Amino acid sequence: MLRLMPVGDSMTIGSAGEHTWRYRLWQHLRETYGGPFRIVGPREALYDKATNTSDSYEYADPDFPRAHLAGWGEGWQHMTPLIADAVRAHKPDVLLVSLGLIDLGFYTDAEQTAEQARTFIAEARLSNPRIAMALLPVIPNVRADTDPPFAAQVAHFNELLAKTAADLDEPRSPLLLTSTPSAYDVNHDTYDGTHPNASGEHKIAGAFADSLYEAWDLGERYGAGEY
């Protein structure tokens, strides 16, 4: 059985009332993947904006495997200390990783963030030397429109992430740099300039799904009808 673990920040955990891209990808794989699979991880909750806590289960559709390793305001530096134990406990075959925006926005520059990504990869491999990882480039948020230095850091980190994936890729533990979400527009695909609305959820799920299909023949391409 194929086990997938979503790892991410606020764009991955989602907040109360949302479906999340995790749900959209699960729906897609349920229809297109030919074998059994599970979504795994140590957490299940959404973020509750009313209480500023990650303890809500008010999904728009709660009837799906909600497991993940994601957190509101958490980035590479927060997930790196957790990933070895999470991989050991939940035994994912594939990590679906969307991290970096919060790091670049508040904690570390592009070079430091890329170093965290390298450490994260090493830690995951300590628990499973054959783990595969699909890495989503950072999607610039609305801040990039008015803060050129921040936009430059995002672009530089994405270049470093691509180099990291190429440098550390191994046949037994492949690293996949996914495509960027198709035609993603923060003015139309988010509800606040950062966090995905329904169309943004579909586009992030599509970026993972298309890359998993093209690189590893998992499932099928994300259909236009799913948007």
List PLM regions with ranges:
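Solvent-exposed loop/turn segments at secondary-structure junctions
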Residues: S10-G14, R43-K49, G100-F106, V138-A144, ...
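Substrate-gating cap/lid alpha-helix
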Residues: I121, P140-S179, A198-H202
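Sec-exported extracytoplasmic/periplasmic mature domains
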Residues: T12, W26, R30-G34, R88-K91, ...
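Histidine-centered active-site loop/cap adjacent to the catalytic His
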Residues: V7, D189-Y227
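Stable alpha-helical elements in mature extracytoplasmic
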Residues: G17, W21, M79, I83, ...
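Loop/turn elements at helix/coil->beta-strand transitions in domains of secreted/extracellular proteins
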Residues: M1-R3, T32-R38, H90-L96, N128-A134, ...
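Conserved SGNH/GDSL esterase-like catalytic core that processes O-acyl groups on lipids
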Residues: L4-M5, M11-E115
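N-terminal hydrophobic signal/anchor transmembrane helix of membrane proteins
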Residues: G35, T80-A89, D167-P196
